[in-house]
């Protein structure tokens, strides 16, 4: 009896240690509050035990200082950070920048000593005031002239966090989001240098294909497809991860991005296989209302009456219905990605975004909130 109890306790301990060994970084987007009806998502919908880190997107920069973006950001900050009352181990970060912020604004701030210093000095008190545990830098697609300025910004921001913590507070975390395209990485990021000063790097391995290609294709393949052209050999998570590691990113700081959204296309002919021509992005979703993008919960609705397929080589699914072609991730594909990153001994997984998963658990017929994120968590925990 005693041996059985001891063995059970050991198994539980191993599972807990396994789960604790991997980060599950989850982004929440503040604009999801504006979606209609059941698509509207606020931070109190988040399970505080689901992710190890939740990143609030995005903060703004005004007069070279970090600032709110939405009119009710302060209220939402408080709602998010209240989750830590239920799970004190949860870490929250505030992401600054993003696609709409643009690279040029970052460039102007980071390229001048005084403006860079003003920005850096503004960050710790802002994070402390609003209850965050760290900052996520989402300077996306910096130009080649920006590479050294980004490195300096990261280095000086980390130094400020170290200095600020000397007062006895827990040191603030510093992370960065990095696009996964080889050209973007080469142009704007000194990976070996910035890795030294970051707690983790979120690799955005989910934007490899889009309507700009004028053909169908998957935006988040795990591996290269057998029919991929040589020009597409870099456009998969496996290559991006391997390339980042070769450039000097430590595996224990690299987090692989997994999307909870799909990309949709409008077919230009009856062809639906790889390379089929398109006339443009797919029709907007009922809630997200953006051409070419669908939340997972919208995809669950689309799948009713659709024909589903799977790229066996790329290990990701797609579906067709009428003239609509949708690439997406499901529980099988996200589990495969989680197993992959474990095999590569990476730091963990990143999810973009919680509000694009079936966060209510009412759309996908499983009676489970956050089915994709939970599937990732289960694999990371060894379940």
UniProtKB/Swiss-Prot annotation:
Domain of life: Eukaryota
Keyword Cytoplasm: yes
Residues annotated to bind chitin: 70-71, 97-100, 141, 204-207, 263, 352
Disulfide pairings: 26-51, 300-364
UniProt-annotated location(s): Secreted, Extracellular space; Cytoplasm; Cytoplasm, Perinuclear region; Endoplasmic reticulum
Leader peptide range in chain numbering: 1-21
GO biological process assignments: activation of NF-kappaB-inducing kinase activity; apoptotic process; carbohydrate metabolic process; cellular response to tumor necrosis factor; chitin catabolic process; inflammatory response; lung development; positive regulation of angiogenesis
GO CC, alphabetical: cytoplasm; endoplasmic reticulum; extracellular space; perinuclear region of cytoplasm
Domain (GH18): residue spans on this chain: 22-383
Keyword terms, alphabetized: Antimicrobial, Apoptosis, Cytoplasm, Disulfide bond, Endoplasmic reticulum, Glycoprotein, Inflammatory response, Lectin, Secreted, Signal
Broad class of where this protein is predominantly found: secreted
Molecular functions per Gene Ontology: carbohydrate binding; chitin binding
Entry-listed glycosylation sites: 60
Gene3D superfamilies reported for this sequence: 3.10.50.10, Glycosidases (3.20.20.80)
Entry coiled-coil feature ranges: none
Tissue: Detected in mammary gland.
Segments for region (Important for AKT1 activation and IL8 production): 324-338
A Pfam family assignment: Glyco_hydro_18
Family of this protein: Belongs to the glycosyl hydrolase 18 family.
PANTHER family: CHITINASE, CHITINASE-3-LIKE PROTEIN 1
Subunit structure: Monomer.
Its job: Carbohydrate-binding lectin with a preference for chitin. Has no chitinase activity. May play a role in tissue remodeling and in the capacity of cells to respond to and cope with changes in their environment. Plays a role in T-helper cell type 2 (Th2) inflammatory response and IL-13-induced inflammation, regulating allergen sensitization, inflammatory cell apoptosis, dendritic cell accumulation and M2 macrophage differentiation. Facilitates invasion of pathogenic enteric bacteria into colonic mucosa and lymphoid organs.
Protein's recorded name: Chitinase-3-like protein 1
């Amino acid at each position: 009896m005693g041996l059985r109890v001891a063995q059970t306790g050991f198994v539980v301990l191993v599972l807990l240690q396994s789960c604790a060994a991997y980060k599950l970084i989850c982004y929440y987007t503040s604009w999801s509050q504006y979606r209609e009806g059941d698509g509207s998502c606020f931070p109190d919908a988040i399970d505080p035990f689901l992710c190890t880190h939740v990143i609030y997107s995005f903060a703004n920069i005004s007069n070279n200082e970090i600032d709110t973006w939405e009119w009710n950001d302060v209220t939402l900050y408080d709602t998010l950070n209240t989750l830590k009352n239920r799970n004190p181990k949860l870490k929250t970060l505030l992401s600054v920048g993003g696609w709409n912020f643009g690279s040029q604004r970052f460039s102007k701030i980071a390229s001048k000593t005084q403006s860079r210093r003003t920005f850096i000095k503004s960050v710790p008190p802002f994070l402390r005031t609003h209850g965050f545990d760290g900052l996520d830098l989402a300077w996306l697609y910096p130009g080649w002239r920006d590479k050294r300025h980004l490195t300096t910004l990261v280095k000086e921001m980390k130094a400020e966090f170290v200095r600020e913590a000397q007062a006895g507070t827990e040191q603030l975390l510093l992370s960065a989001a990095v696009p996964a395209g080889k050209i973007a990485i080469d142009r704007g990021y000194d990976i070996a240098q910035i890795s030294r000063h970051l707690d983790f790097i979120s690799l955005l391995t989910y934007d490899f294909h889009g309507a700009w290609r004028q053909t169908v294709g998957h935006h988040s393949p795990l591996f290269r497809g057998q029919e991929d052209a040589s020009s597409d050999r870099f456009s998969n998570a496996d290559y991006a991860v391997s390339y980042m590691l070769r450039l000097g990113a430590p595996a224990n700081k690299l987090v692989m991005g997994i999307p909870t959204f799909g990309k949709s296309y409008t077919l230009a002919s009856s062809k639906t296989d790889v390379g089929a021509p398109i006339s443009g992005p797919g029709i907007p979703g009922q809630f997200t209302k953006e051409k070419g993008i669908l939340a997972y919960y919208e995809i669950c609705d689309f799948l009713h009456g659709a024909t589903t397929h799977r790229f066996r080589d790329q290990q990701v699914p797609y579906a067709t219905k009428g003239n609509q072609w949708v690439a997406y991730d499901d529980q099988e594909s996200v589990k495969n990605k989680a197993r992959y990153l474990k095999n590569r001994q990476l730091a963990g997984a990143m999810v973009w975004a919680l509000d694009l998963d079936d966060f209510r658990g009412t759309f996908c017929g499983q009676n489970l909130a956050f089915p994709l994120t939970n599937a990732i968590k289960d694999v990371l925990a060894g379940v």
